[in-house]
C-alpha cells in the first residue's frame, strides 16, 4: 500500500513540474516558440533589450582626395608669374599637398616634372646642355639615365620599347631640332609606346615646345598607322607589349631591324603649319602629318578618314591645302 501511494505521489509531482514548465514557456515573451490554445506557433519576437548595430560613419580624413587639379592650377599660376615660390609653398601647406618646385624644370613654355627624357638630335646636345646645365647624355647600354636625359629619337624608342628607364613616372620632351622633319611614323610610334606603358602602370607625359601633347593614338591605332608607312615598325609595338606582359602571340621577330626614317622622300611640313591647319579643321595634328605624307595617294587618304572617323571630303580638303602651301 505504501509503495502504491508513494508511486502516485511521485507521478503527481512530475505532472506538477511539467505544468509549471509549460506555464513558463507560455509567458516567456523572448521565446521564438510559445504555446497558444494548445498549438505551437513560430514567430520572431524582437528583444527590446538587444542593442541595434550602429551604422558605420565614414571618416572624412580617410577618403583619398585627388589634388592633381590644384597642383596644375598652382603650377600654371606660378609659370605665368601670378604667384611666386613662397606663395606656392604656402598654398601647398594650406591644402596639405606635396608640391616642390624643385621637382620641376622650365623647358620652352612648359614647367615639366622631372625626371625628363629630352628627345633631340645629337648635334644639338651641346646647345641644350648650355641652356639646361643639368641635362646629360644618357647611355641605355649601361642603363645610365640622368634626371634630365638627352637621347636621340632612335635610342628613345629602344628605351621605351624595352622599358630600360629606371622610373615609373617621367616626362618626355621633343626638342625643336625634331620640329620640322620628325617622321610621322615616329610620332605615331611614340604615341603607341606611351599608351602601352600607361596600360602597364607607367605615368608618362609628352611635351613639345607648345606644351603638353595629348596622346591622340592608342596602341592599336598606332600599330595600324605605322604599318601603312613601314610594316616593320609594328613589330616594335609588339615587342613592347611582350616586355610588359600584355601580349604573347604577336610577331616581334627581329624587331630591332627597322628603318625609322624610310628610304622614300617625305613631304616636309613645318610644325606651326601643322598646328594651324589642325586648328582650322578641328582635327588631330597627327592626322595632318599623315595627310602631308600621303598627298597623291587617295587610297591612304580614304583609310585615314576612316581610321580617324572624319569625313573623307575633309581629308581631301586638308590634302589640297597642304599641297598648295608646299
From Swiss-Prot:
It is found in: Virion. One of its GO terms (cellular component) is virion component. Keywords: Virion. It comes from the Viruses. Residues 1-28 are annotated as: Disordered. Residues 11-26 have a biased composition (Acidic residues). This is Structural protein ORF326a.
Amino acid at each position: 500500500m505504501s509503495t502504491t501511494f508513494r508511486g502516485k505521489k511521485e507521478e503527481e509531482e512530475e505532472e506538477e513540474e511539467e505544468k509549471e514548465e509549460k506555464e513558463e514557456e507560455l509567458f516567456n515573451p523572448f521565446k521564438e516558440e510559445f504555446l497558444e490554445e494548445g498549438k505551437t506557433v513560430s514567430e520572431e519576437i524582437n528583444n527590446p533589450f538587444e542593442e541595434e548595430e550602429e551604422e558605420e560613419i565614414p571618416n572624412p580624413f580617410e577618403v583619398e582626395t585627388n589634388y592633381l587639379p590644384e597642383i596644375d592650377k598652382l603650377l600654371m599660376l606660378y609659370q605665368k608669374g601670378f604667384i611666386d615660390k613662397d606663395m606656392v609653398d604656402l598654398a601647398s601647406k594650406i591644402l596639405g599637398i606635396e608640391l616642390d618646385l624643385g621637382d620641376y624644370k622650365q623647358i620652352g613654355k612648359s614647367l615639366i616634372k622631372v625626371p625628363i627624357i629630352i628627345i633631340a638630335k645629337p648635334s644639338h646636345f651641346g646647345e641644350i646642355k648650355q641652356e639646361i646645365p643639368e641635362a646629360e647624355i644618357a647611355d641605355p647600354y649601361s642603363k645610365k639615365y640622368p634626371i634630365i636625359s638627352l637621347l636621340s629619337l632612335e635610342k628613345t624608342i629602344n628605351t621605351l620599347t624595352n622599358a630600360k628607364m629606371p622610373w615609373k613616372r617621367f616626362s618626355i620632351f621633343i626638342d625643336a631640332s625634331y620640329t620640322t622633319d620628325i617622321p610621322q611614323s615616329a610620332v605615331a610610334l611614340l604615341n603607341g609606346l606611351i599608351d602601352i606603358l600607361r596600360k602597364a602602370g607607367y605615368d608618362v607625359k609628352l611635351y613639345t615646345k607648345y606644351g603638353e601633347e595629348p596622346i591622340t593614338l592608342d596602341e592599336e591605332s598606332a600599330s595600324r598607322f605605322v604599318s601603312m608607312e613601314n610594316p616593320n615598325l609594328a613589330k616594335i609595338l609588339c615587342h613592347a607589349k611582350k616586355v610588359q606582359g600584355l601580349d604573347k602571340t604577336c610577331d616581334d621577330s627581329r624587331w630591332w631591324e627597322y628603318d625609322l626614317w624610310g628610304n622614300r622622300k617625305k613631304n616636309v611640313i613645318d610644325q606651326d603649319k601643322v598646328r594651324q591647319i589642325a586648328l582650322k579643321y578641328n582635327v588631330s595634328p597627327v592626322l595632318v602629318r599623315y595627310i602631308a605624307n600621303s598627298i597623291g595617294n587617295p587610297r591612304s587618304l580614304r583609310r585615314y578618314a576612316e581610321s580617324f572617323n572624319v569625313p573623307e571630303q575633309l581629308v581631301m580638303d586638308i590634302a589640297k591645302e597642304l599641297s598648295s602651301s608646299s
